[in-house]
Amino acid sequence: MVLDLDLFRVDKGGDPALIRETQEKRFKDPGLVDQLVKADSEWRRCRFRADNLNKLKNLCSKTIGEKMKKKEPVEDDESVPENVLNFDDLTADALANLKVSQIKKVRLLIDEAILKCDAERIKLEAERFENLREIGNLLHPSVPISNDEDADNKVERIWGDCTVRKKYSHVDLVVMVDGFEGEKGAVVAGSRGYFLKGVLVFLEQALIQYALRTLGSRGYTPIYTPFFMRKEVMQEVAQLSQFDEELYKVIGKGSEKSDDNSYDEKYLIATSEQPIAALHRDEWLRPEDLPIKYAGLSTCFRQEVGSHGRDTRGIFRVHQFEKIEQFVYSSPHDNKSWEMFEEMITTAEEFYQSLGIPYHIVNIVSGSLNHAASKKLDLEAWFPGSGAFRELVSCSNCTDYQARRLRIRYGQTKKMMDKVEFVHMLNATMCATTRTICAILENYQTEKGITVPEKLKEFMPPGLQELIPFVKPAPIDQEPSKKQKKQHEGSKKKAAARDVALESRLQNMEVTDA
């Protein structure tokens, strides 16, 4: 995931100041731009020198051939005049004045210079790339500039009644319908581990089927993705920080051969966006085939580093969940990708409207965008039991930022175009099932249970098409209040004190009797 290097090159029409400004608006280090420009300038000089050295090497070989044809003596003289050692000014005439043995020596020296130049070029290329991959995409003009998403995310629109309050939160409701095993899940899988069971398994499958049907009717091709990716491919779709904060590493045998002792490093996917982004890696996509729209279905795995203490109960924020994703490859021309961006968020909105989930759409501030996103809109549902908006959907246009690293090009072949262009890539959540279940539970709770949303009834089994009944008490109703806890602790202390006093009196009585 990177920007076009020509954007940093003034002689190619680029504007480093614009990228520096983008970094500042993202509240990231603008000095990376200057470091990249410096490394790139030195790299280009190094490559120019290497090209000239290779030309000189070929000239040496050609001159030797001409002299051999003339049957000039080879001799053993390998001394090289000082003026010839300055390869930048070496000419064909200067070489012609040398003996064959001297030219051979010059060619060897040129070989050494080429090797040295190549080593320097590789070093500069690595330095340039280290800076390039940490510089974010150019921002869309409509992105709010701020580093505080809690205060400055811009609400674009609201749908439904986002003021209504209800009694229970999803943390209690998943227990009340007996659809969740949290403590046992944590024993088996660790923190945030869970078993989804019974009615919530049916509700999850209903959401998956309804989401896939909805996207299928809009021209999306359903696709079930791999759950893990090779390290070198994941590096092309994920930014560096994700490897530390989000992705799980999987170590396995290098091959299926029993005598193979090598090991292979893979990463579990955090979203189906990652493998779908790599689906057309190293391909040319024809204009007439675009847009290509995929409805990705996968299990997702996230470490959630940095989320310590947040949403530790229930199924809203977990390490493993199912998700249906919109993913689109679009033309880079005529504002097509931005039209698609609006279409994708609209598709998500219509899905949640059909489920009767109130929400608002927020334009995410620049400081909270990942490197790839030029703009991101979130759909945050209203949770009436929790009294809060919670994110269900993220919709991003990454323009050509991802495609450039993956080498997914637009058009026929390089020969047909003046300059290689790259497709635009967009992604949007359709339904992260556990989060959507939480939203449904809170919005559709009644005194007796959870009313099944109209659109999901046909996907639910007999007996659960109208109402998911409560079969257990709410945990919050079983927990003693702080006052009750304090009174109970006080009573325990008083009782303990009485026991000590009684024991003391009994001992005194025994002494007196004796």
Curated annotation (Swiss-Prot):
- Region entry Disordered, spans: 471-514
Binding sites annotated in the UniProt record for L-serine = T271, R302, E325, N427
Q: According to the UniProt entry, which residue ranges have a biased composition of type Basic and acidic residues?
A: 479-502
| PROSITE patterns (alphabetical) | AA_TRNA_LIGASE_II (PS50862)
Q: Which residues carry this modification: N6-acetyllysine?
A: K323
Q: Which reaction does it catalyse?
A: tRNA(Ser) + L-serine + ATP = L-seryl-tRNA(Ser) + AMP + diphosphate + H(+); tRNA(Sec) + L-serine + ATP = L-seryl-tRNA(Sec) + AMP + diphosphate + H(+)
User: Into which EC class is this enzyme placed?
Assistant: ligase
As stated in the Swiss-Prot or TrEMBL entry, residues carrying the post-translational modification N-acetylmethionine are: M1
Give the Polar residues compositional bias ranges.
Answer: 505-514
Q: Respond yes or no to whether keyword Ligase is given for this record.
A: yes
Q: Which GO terms describe its molecular function?
A: ATP binding; RNA polymerase II cis-regulatory region sequence-specific DNA binding; selenocysteine-tRNA ligase activity; serine-tRNA ligase activity
Its chief place of residence is: cytoplasm
Residues binding ATP: R302, Q303, E304, V318, H319, Q320, F321, E391, L392, V393, S394
What Pfam families does this protein map onto? Seryl_tRNA_N, tRNA-synt_2b
Q: Which residues carry this modification: Phosphoserine?
A: S241
Q: Which UniProt keywords apply?
A: Acetylation, Aminoacyl-tRNA synthetase, ATP-binding, Cytoplasm, DNA-binding, Ligase, Nucleotide-binding, Nucleus, Phosphoprotein, Protein biosynthesis
Q: Does the keyword Transmembrane helix apply?
A: no
Q: Where is this motif: Nuclear localization signal?
A: 482-494
Assembly description: Homodimer. The tRNA molecule may bind across the dimer. Interacts with SIRT2. Interacts with METTL6; interaction is required for the tRNA N(3)-methylcytidine methyltransferase activity of METTL6.
- What is the stated purpose of this protein? Catalyzes the attachment of serine to tRNA(Ser) in a two-step reaction: serine is first activated by ATP to form Ser-AMP and then transferred to the acceptor end of tRNA(Ser). Is probably also able to aminoacylate tRNA(Sec) with serine, to form the misacylated tRNA L-seryl-tRNA(Sec), which will be further converted into selenocysteinyl-tRNA(Sec). In the nucleus, binds to the VEGFA core promoter and prevents MYC binding and transcriptional activation by MYC. Recruits SIRT2 to the VEGFA promoter, promoting deacetylation of histone H4 at 'Lys-16' (H4K16).
Stored NCBIfam families: serS
Q: What is this protein called?
A: Serine--tRNA ligase, cytoplasmic
